[in-house]
């Protein structure tokens, strides 16, 4: 997390100064996990201060004492400095632990705040929903009863829920109850009550959980860890005492040797003993106590922080659960939909009635309009056919053309849906009146009444056609005349016409009153002269003279017969004056009529302009209101989306953390499974070895069994042989007894015979003694042989250690084995001799010698010993055979060891070559990394034993910095290439030294520092790239926006290709030149084209397609031509001057010729229908067609008669075209085309291009 309690993001990781990392194992594990606490510091026992003085009167003894105390003080300061450093480190760690817990708490507070806001919104929504549910549950039975009393005569099969019974659908009349399933509503009412209670309990549970989370969070805030305490600065005081002792020692060193010096030194030493040394001991004890306190505080902080983190983790788990409950907070049953359908059924039924009428009328209108259109097209087709026949008849002598069929139109109506029930407007009105009669359904009746009124409301297209203005501009009336005079439009036009007639009647009555008042006022103040005022009333004047004048003329004519000639002359004069008076009256009446007509026209124009202005202002105000509402809506949406974005980011962080935790668990599980798999592999191998051993044991056992079986067979065979031998011996003994005692009776049993023979064999005792001695020697030799076999076994075990010893021992064993075989052969030969002697003795006994029983017993014992010796001999032979087998096995092992040695030598050589290649690759990689850093603009140096990566500009910034680097031990980190041959050393020690040097050279290049530098560089580049990309995107959007805005705006400050310009005629009537309306950018003239039809226009709105820059140069025609082109006699000179200066500009003036295409071809020459969208431009004035000198004529003459050289050399003539300058181009796109106001300052050139009001209005008065 960051220090602000936010989760760290990869995008902003490079901009964070510090981050806090937490170990999930200690946070999410149960409480029995033990923390790695800091051990208590070792007991501190300072040495006793030196106080031994050999001689009080010897200065050197005092110096030695001072030096010892100085050394003691410095050593104590060093030890206390280490403890003080440990105290500061422990305090820093403790402070970090406190801050980490505080950061986690801040993060939790943010989550809890978001949870409270979300819960408040959810609770508001839930409370409103519960109110609606309670209201629905309280009155659904009454509403269901009410449906029974509301008639519903029309049958709509599609109305109602799918479960609604259909048995009453065929009835011609019924109620709204027929469209509702009463049983389903009853069940839904009971289910809705239970669901509402469950939903309320769910809201209460969520509220209780939120309150619990808030209370636990507040408890954590109240129990927040305190800040770490600063350790007392006793080390500085101890250093001060040590410096005092050192300075005293230096002072003592410089003192002379006399009694006064000794006295001063003694007093100073006493001060040390009483003040300084005890104070240093006390301070050291305080520092050690502070160290113990820091360790204890650190361990306590770890435990408390761990408890807080576990509490925070538990709260966050609960918080995630509550958030999921809030998200999933909803009614899980459709019962309320069924209940609400009871309330909505009256409105739904009424809406269906209105919709039925609307669809029926639309279908009828479509049919009628299609018939009308078909008839009209048929009339057009018949007229066209008659015209073609008439034309062919008149042209029949000149052309030969077959009569073709005139194309016609066939109209078909498609997409008609199935017929709805017939519903009239009276049905709707009666249904609404029935609803109005019920007080509880007044609001439903009002809604249906509004829907019923909307049947007669014009559509959006009809409203647009009813109004002549669309957002401040005249609506396009160039649509087809077909299908536009529908009944709705005619009805709307009649309404508009009636409204306008009423307004016109009121206006006419008001105008009559005003004219009458004006006429009365003018009669009172009419002048005598013939200069009548133009503001006479418009009341109709009688063409006949008034009664007084008529009576006077009649009387004068009557008296004329009785008058004299003078009287007749006077009478004629009176008649003439009366005729003139009548003519003058007629003139006055005509002028009054013209003034009245003009006043009416001006009044209409003013009213039209004011109505246009009001429409424009209303449109602007409506759009402004729409914009304000949209802005407020968008601001609310933006705030909502920001909150949602933060919530999603937090959710994403939690999901990422959970995924990381799951990934960590999966990794641990994978590692555990891999370990178990390895253990299983090892166990499998052991089992395989064990199985192989068992197989070998089984094979050995089988072999042993076979040998035992063979041995049993041999023993059985021997037993049978022994039996046969016994039988033979019995027979032999009987024969011997018979030979020894021919007359005696032969005993039946062998022992009796043997005893008898022993008695007879006493004479052979001497020979038996000799045989015993030889047997004893054979037994001794057998024992020696057994000992030798044991020795051979030990020697075989020793042979495992060395191959050479095995060979020698093997040879020795072979020799000894041969000797033993020879000895065995000798023993066998001796046994054979003994047996032969025994047989000889037996034969001698058989010949007649007598023996005793003792001799017989000796013979039996000898035979027994002989059997034992034979058995031992067999065992020795078996052991000899086993020894031969072991010798063969050792030979095979020796051979395998030799092959292994050869393979190991080959593998070591291969590994040496690979190690060399690997070392070379590592060396090249280090060089590539250094080269990469150099390419990125870094310099890699080693300063004071640490690698430093700096910018090359910083390293080479100044010579002073370079000198300081050189003094601080800056060296290159590039490894030495000679270290690559470390594996080619002659001795093992040398190879080890070279290899360690090679590793040391590689360790000098710190990959972490390299990675940090490269990552920081890449992140800086990415940050800069994102910044530039964002700016480029903003500039591109701004450019597109300005370009789109400029495309539809009139440019008047500067011009470039593609700009929209307003062209007006200039005052030059002779050549009828047209120039662009401008402010500060004169001399942009239009190239006239036939498509422009400028003779019938007062203005032209066109888009510039091409701009040609030209400069007037009259020097070409100054040598032989008059400046005035009207005085030139030749046509060629006139033509050249027209090409160079077609608009009669002064010499050296820069001007531009524009090619432009009309923006809307086919537009009327003047604003449509004799009207204008801006203020009226008609001015009541009379002027002469001749050109007049204005007051500014002198200035114009001065400007046009400047020096040719000065005008050619002026900066205005040397300027480039304005369309080549981006700034003017931007101004042309940014400025709006507004009518020039009276107070807008114009440049002198613009004043030259401007015309007098009379001359400008003269052209405008020629319009319609």
Curated annotation (Swiss-Prot):
The keyword RNA-binding does not apply. The keyword Coiled coil applies. It is found in: Preautophagosomal structure membrane; Vacuole membrane. Residues 528-567, 1118-1140, 1180-1264 are annotated as: Disordered. One of its GO terms (cellular component) is Atg1/ULK1 kinase complex. Homodimer. This is Autophagy-related protein 11. The gene is atg11.
């Amino acid at each position: 997390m960051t220090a602000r309690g936010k989760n760290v993001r990869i995008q902003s990781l490079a901009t964070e100064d510090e981050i806090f990392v937490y170990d999930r194992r200690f946070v999410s594990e149960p409480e029995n996990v033990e923390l790695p606490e800091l051990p208590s510091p070792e007991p501190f026992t300072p040495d006793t201060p030196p106080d031994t003085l050999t001689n009080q009167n010897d200065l050197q003894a005092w110096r030695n004492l001072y030096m010892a105390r100085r050394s003691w003080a410095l050593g104590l300061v060093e030890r206390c400095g280490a403890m003080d450093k440990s105290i500061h480190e422990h305090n820093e760690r403790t402070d970090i632990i406190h801050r980490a817990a505080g950061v986690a708490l801040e993060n939790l507070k943010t989550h809890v705040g978001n949870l409270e806001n979300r819960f408040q919104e959810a609770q508001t929504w839930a409370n409103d929903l519960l109110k609606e549910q309670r209201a629905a549950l309280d009155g659904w039975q009454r509403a269901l009863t009410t449906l029974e009393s509301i008639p519903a005569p029309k049958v709509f099969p599609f109305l109602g829920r799918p479960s609604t019974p259909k048995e009453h659908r065929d009835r011609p009349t019924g109620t709204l109850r027929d469209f509702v399933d009463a049983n389903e509503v009853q069940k839904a009412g009971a289910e809705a009550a239970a669901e509402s209670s469950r939903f309320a309990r769910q809201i209460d549970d969520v509220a209780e959980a939120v309150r619990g989370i808030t209370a636990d969070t507040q408890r954590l805030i109240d129990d927040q860890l305190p800040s770490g305490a600063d350790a007392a600065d006793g080390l500085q005081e101890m250093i001060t005492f040590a410096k005092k002792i050192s300075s005293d020692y230096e002072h003592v060193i410089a003192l002379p040797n006399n009694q006064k010096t000794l006295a001063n030194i003694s007093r100073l030493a006493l001060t040390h003993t009483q003040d300084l040394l005890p104070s240093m001991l006390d301070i050291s004890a305080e520092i050690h106590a502070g160290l113990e306190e820091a360790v204890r505080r650190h361990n306590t902080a770890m435990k408390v922080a761990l408890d807080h983190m576990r509490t925070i983790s538990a709260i966050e788990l609960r918080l995630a659960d509550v958030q999921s409950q809030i998200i999933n907070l909803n009614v899980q049953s459709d019962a309320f939909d069924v209940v609400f359908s009871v309330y909505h059924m009256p409105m739904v039924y009424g809406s269906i009635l209105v919709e039925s009428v609307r669809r029926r009328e639309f279908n009828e209108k479509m049919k009628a309009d299609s018939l009308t259109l078909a008839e009209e097209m048929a009339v057009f087709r018949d007229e066209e056919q008659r015209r073609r026949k008439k034309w062919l008849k008149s042209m029949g002598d000149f052309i030969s053309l077959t009569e073709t069929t005139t194309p016609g139109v066939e109209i078909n109506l498609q997409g008609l849906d199935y017929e709805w029930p017939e519903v009239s407007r009276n049905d709707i009105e009666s249904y609404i009146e029935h609803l109005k009669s019920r007080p509880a359904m007044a609001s439903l009746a009002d809604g249906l009444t509004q829907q019923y009124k909307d049947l007669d409301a014009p559509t959006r297209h009809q409203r647009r056609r009813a109004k002549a203005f669309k957002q401040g501009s005249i609506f396009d009336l160039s649509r087809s005349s077909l299908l536009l005079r529908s009944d709705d439009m005619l009805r709307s036009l009649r309404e508009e016409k009636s409204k306008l007639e009423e307004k016109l009647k009121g206006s006419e009555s008001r105008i009559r009153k005003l004219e009458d008042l004006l006429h009365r006022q003018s009669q009172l103040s009419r002048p005598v002269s013939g200069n009548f005022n133009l503001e006479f009333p418009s009341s109709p004047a009688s063409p006949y003279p008034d009664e007084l004048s008529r009576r006077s003329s009649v009387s004068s004519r009557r008296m004329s017969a009785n008058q004299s000639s003078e009287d007749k002359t006077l009478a004629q004069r009176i008649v003439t004056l009366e005729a003139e008076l009548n003519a003058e009256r007629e003139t006055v009446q005509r002028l009054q009529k013209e003034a009245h007509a003009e006043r009416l026209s001006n009044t209409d124009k003013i009213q039209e302009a004011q109505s246009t202005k009001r429409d424009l202002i209303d449109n602007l105000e409506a759009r402004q209101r729409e914009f304000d509402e949209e802005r407020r809506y968008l601001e609310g949406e933006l705030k909502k989306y920001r909150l949602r974005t933060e919530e999603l980011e937090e959710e994403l962080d939690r999901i990422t953390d959970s995924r990381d935790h799951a990934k960590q668990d999966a990794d641990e599980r994978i590692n555990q499974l891999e370990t178990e798999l390895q253990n299983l592999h090892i166990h499998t191998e052991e089992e395989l070895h064990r199985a192989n051993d068992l197989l070998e044991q089984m094979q050995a056992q089988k072999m042993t069994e076979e040998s035992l079986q063979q041995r049993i067979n041999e023993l059985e065979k021997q037993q049978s042989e022994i039996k046969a031998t016994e039988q033979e011996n019995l027979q032999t003994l009987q024969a011997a007894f018979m030979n020894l005692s021919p007359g005696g009776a032969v005993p039946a049993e062998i022992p009796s015979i043997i005893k008898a023979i022993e008695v007879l064999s006493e004479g052979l005792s001497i020979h038996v003694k000799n045989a015993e001695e030889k047997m004893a020697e054979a037994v001794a030799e057998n024992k020696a042989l057994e000992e030798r076999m044991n020795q051979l076994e030990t020697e075989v075990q020793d042979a495992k250690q060395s191959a050479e010893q095995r060979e020698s021992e093997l040879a020795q064993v072979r020799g000894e084995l041969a000797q033993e075989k020879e000895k065995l052969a000798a023993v066998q030969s001796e046994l054979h001799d003994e047996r032969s002697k025994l047989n000889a003795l037996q034969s001698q006994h058989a010949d007649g010698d007598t023996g005793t029983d003792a001799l017989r017993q000796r013979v039996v014992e000898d035979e027994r010993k002989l059997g034992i010796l034979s058995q031992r001999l067999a065992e020795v032979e078996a052991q000899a055979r086993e020894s031969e087998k072991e010798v063969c096995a050792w030979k095979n092992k020796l051979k395998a060891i030799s092959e292994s040695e050869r393979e190991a030598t080959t593998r070591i050589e291969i590994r040496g070559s690979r190690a060399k290649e690997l070392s070379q690759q590592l060396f090249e990689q280090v060089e590539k990394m250094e080269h990469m850093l150099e390419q990125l603009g870094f310099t890699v140096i080693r300063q004071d034993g640490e690698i430093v990566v700096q910018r090359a500009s910083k390293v080479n910034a100044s010579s002073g910095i370079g000198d300081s680097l050189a003094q601080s031990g800056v060296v290159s980190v590039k490894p030495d290439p000679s270290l690559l041959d470390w594996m080619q050393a002659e001795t093992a020690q040398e190879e080890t030294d070279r290899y360690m040097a090679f590793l040391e050279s590689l360790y000098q290049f710190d990959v972490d520092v390299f990675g940090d530098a490269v990552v920081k560089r890449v992140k800086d580049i990415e940050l800069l790239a994102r910044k530039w990309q964002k700016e480029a995107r903003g500039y591109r959007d701004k450019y597109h926006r300005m370009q789109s805005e400029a495309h539809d705006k009139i440019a008047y400050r500067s011009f470039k290709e593609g700009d929209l310009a307003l062209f007006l005629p200039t005052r030059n009537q002779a050549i009828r030149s047209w120039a662009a309306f401008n402010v500060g950018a004169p001399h942009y003239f239009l190239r006239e084209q036939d498509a422009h039809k400028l003779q019938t226009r007062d203005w032209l709105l066109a888009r510039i397609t091409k701009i040609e820059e030209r400069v007037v140069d009259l020097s070409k025609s100054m040598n032989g031509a008059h400046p005035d082109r009207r005085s030139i006699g030749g046509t060629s000179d006139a033509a050249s001057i027209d090409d160079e200066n077609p608009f009669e500009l002064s010499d050296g003036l820069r001007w531009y010729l524009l090619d432009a295409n009309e923006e809307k071809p086919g537009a009327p020459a003047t604003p449509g229908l004799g009207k204008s969208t801006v203020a009226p431009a008609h001015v009541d004035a009379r002027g002469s067609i001749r050109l007049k000198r204005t007051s500014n004529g002198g200035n114009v003459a001065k400007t046009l008669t400047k020096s040719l050289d000065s005008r050619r050399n002026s900066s205005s003539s040397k300027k480039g075209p304005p369309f080549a300058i981006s700034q003017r181009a931007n101004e042309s796109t940014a400025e709006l085309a507004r009518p020039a106001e009276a107070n807008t300052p114009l440049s002198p050139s613009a004043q030259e291009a401007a015309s007098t009001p009379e001359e400008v209005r003269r052209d405008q008065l020629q319009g319609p």
